[in-house]
Amino acid sequence: MTPAFELQGVQFAYKGVPALNGLDLTLPLGRRTALLGANGSGKSTLLRLLDGLQFPAAGRISAFGTPLTEAMFTDEAAAIAFRRRVGFVFQNPEVQLFCPSVFDELAFGPLQLHWPKERIRARVARAIAQFGLGPLAGRPPHRLSGGEKKRVALASVLILDPEVLLLDEPTAALDPQATDDIAALLETEFGARNPGRTLIFSSHDLDLVARIADHVVVLEAGKVAAAGPAAEVLARTALLRRARLLPGFDGTAP
């Protein structure tokens, strides 16, 4: 099966500081992949490259077997086709919530894709019920709590039914109840009810990863330190300590 994404020798730097350093990685379709690693290991950079928001200085990325390049996004039809298949929710959802109400936020994507008005109304109504947004539908997104903003951002992407969802730290800065709400939402949307969907998310929360992921990639200094079934990777405590994900870092090899 063609993977969702394949990266070969990918390099990327911010102001001369390497973020990804010759990264080789295959991300399969139909899996729930968690990206783990210390701050600065390259997780957020990787997600931005997978979404076509940035492009590598060297190396190659393919999406669904097709090269993911700047040139692809100059072709309107190709760009729209990619955006229909891939959705991205930022760590800070405020950067993608800009409509006057939650209802308008949910309708924005379908409007951009020129869905018929009847289809938009029906799908937005279903999303409001599906994601428990009824009491929030008429409110401005910027006045919502952190957990509510995250839920609206997720709903505004999932309403388009993307094949792949990219999430950057989905529960960062949320309280325990909001964290549990987001985890439950992800379990529902990417569980047995939707077996073909692909989730790729970064996190420092090992409890969330154990609950959601079936595949884990650990990044270290812009390279893959480990990848495999979630239970196997999460059992490698020395590796997780080295990645600052468990207390007791001692510098030893996994």
Curated annotation (Swiss-Prot):
Location of the ABC transporter domain: 5-246
Location (main, coarse): membrane
EC code(s) of this entry: 7.2.2.11
Compartments reported by the entry: Cell inner membrane
Biological-process GO terms, alphabetical: nickel cation transport
Entry keyword set: ATP-binding, Cell inner membrane, Cell membrane, Ion transport, Membrane, Nickel, Nickel transport, Nucleotide-binding, Translocase, Transport
Highest taxon of source: Bacteria
GO CC term (a single one): ATP-binding cassette (ABC) transporter complex
Pfam families for the chain: ABC_tran
Stored Gene3D superfamilies: P-loop containing nucleotide triphosphate hydrolases (3.40.50.300)
Binding site for ATP: G37, A38, N39, G40, S41, G42, K43, S44
Reaction(s) this enzyme catalyzes, per UniProt: Ni(2+)(out) + ATP + H2O = Ni(2+)(in) + ADP + phosphate + H(+)
Top-level EC class as recorded in UniProt: translocase
Membrane topology according to the record: Peripheral membrane protein
GO MF annotations in UniProt: ATP binding; ATP hydrolysis activity; ATPase-coupled transmembrane transporter activity
Function: Part of the energy-coupling factor (ECF) transporter complex NikMNQO involved in nickel import. The complex confers nickel uptake upon expression in E.coli. Shows very low activity with cobalt. Presumably responsible for energy coupling to the transport system.
Family that this chain belongs to: Belongs to the ABC transporter superfamily.
Subunit structure: Forms an energy-coupling factor (ECF) transporter complex composed of an ATP-binding protein (A component, NikO), a transmembrane protein (T component, NikQ) and a fused possible substrate-capture protein (S component, NikMN) of unknown stoichimetry.
Protein name: Nickel import ATP-binding protein NikO
Organism: Rhodobacter capsulatus (strain ATCC BAA-309 / NBRC 16581 / SB1003)
